[in-house]
Amino acid sequence: MIFSTLEHILTHISLSIILILMTIHLIIFLVDEIRKLYDSSEKGMLVTFFCITGLLATHWISSEHFPLSDLYESFIFLSWSFALIHIIPYFTKNTKFLSKIISPSAIFTQGFATSGLLTEIHQSSILVPALKSEWLIMHVSMMILGYAALLCGSLLSVALLVITFRKNGKLFSGGNDFLTESFLFGENLFQKTSFFSAKNYYRTQFIQQLDFWSYRVISLGFLFLTIGILSGAVWANEAWGSYWSWDPKETWAFITWIVFAIFLHTRTNLNLQSVNSAIVASIVASIGFLIIWICYFGVNLVGIGLHSYGSFPSTSS
């Protein structure tokens, strides 16, 4: 009872802060000179991260299982993963721009997770027999962490495309201060460009930085996704006697894996190391962004297959 009350309080605190952060970001979008508001929003994100962490911990204790058994619990974990990835670059020198790009999505996922829209599917704390396995934490946590990292990396790729094809105007709030931070990284994919001048120096440097970090974040997410798929296959064999059954969730997870494998191949192929390869890879990652949401959220609308226990009650089989 105490933990349920604490969980309820943490949920409302998180949602209240998220609503305030949404208002702050709207003000910053309209009046981009107000930089102090951005600092306040970042501190608010830290508070919500700790609230979500406490929410996961109290829910784990009250339900007596790791909170990854349905769509509601997994979305809470996804929002926590998003927030974790968001705050890491905030405390790292020269990478705060990553937080600026990721923060809107982190705020959205946290707001949706704590809004109560998914509470209808979380009606019982009793696990179905298939979920009573030690593989639950390994498989689902790796998949969710993979989704979060791939989504964040894809957002950086989307930003790369926007900056590449946008020729005029400020890139982000704060004007050139955002771009004139030190750009220190180990490789230069754009050194063969023929239009290197003072006018496009910061723009080119920023594009390189986006490409550098999108590749690394997506690589990390791809590793998590691969581990999640393999552990899920082993778990499926133990539970149902088959490593793979091609149900909707498994099929779309495989499609997601293929898409980001193409991204990594395009990005690392020595014969394709050029500006165009970075753009092509970013386009692939942008497509992957949509596919991840179809795999994670869209498939649950169907409510069929071995993963239907995580879908909405109105569509569950």
Swiss-Prot record:
InterPro entries in the cross-refs: Cyt_c_assembly (IPR002541), Cyt_c_biogenesis_CcsA (IPR017562), Cyt_c_biogenesis_CcsA/CcmC (IPR045062)
Segments passing through the bilayer: 9-29, 44-64, 71-91, 101-121, 143-163, 217-237, 244-264, 279-299
Main location: plastid
Keyword Transmembrane helix (UniProt): yes
Record keywords, A-Z: Chloroplast, Cytochrome c-type biogenesis, Membrane, Plastid, Thylakoid, Transmembrane, Transmembrane helix
One GO MF term attached to the UniProt entry: heme binding
Domain of life: Eukaryota
Membrane topology listed for this record: Multi-pass membrane protein
Compartment(s) of residence: Plastid, Chloroplast thylakoid membrane
Subunit structure: May interact with Ccs1.
UniProt-listed NCBIfam families: cytochr_II_ccsB
Family according to the record: Belongs to the CcmF/CycK/Ccl1/NrfE/CcsA family.
Protein name as annotated: Cytochrome c biogenesis protein CcsA
Name of the encoding gene: ccsA
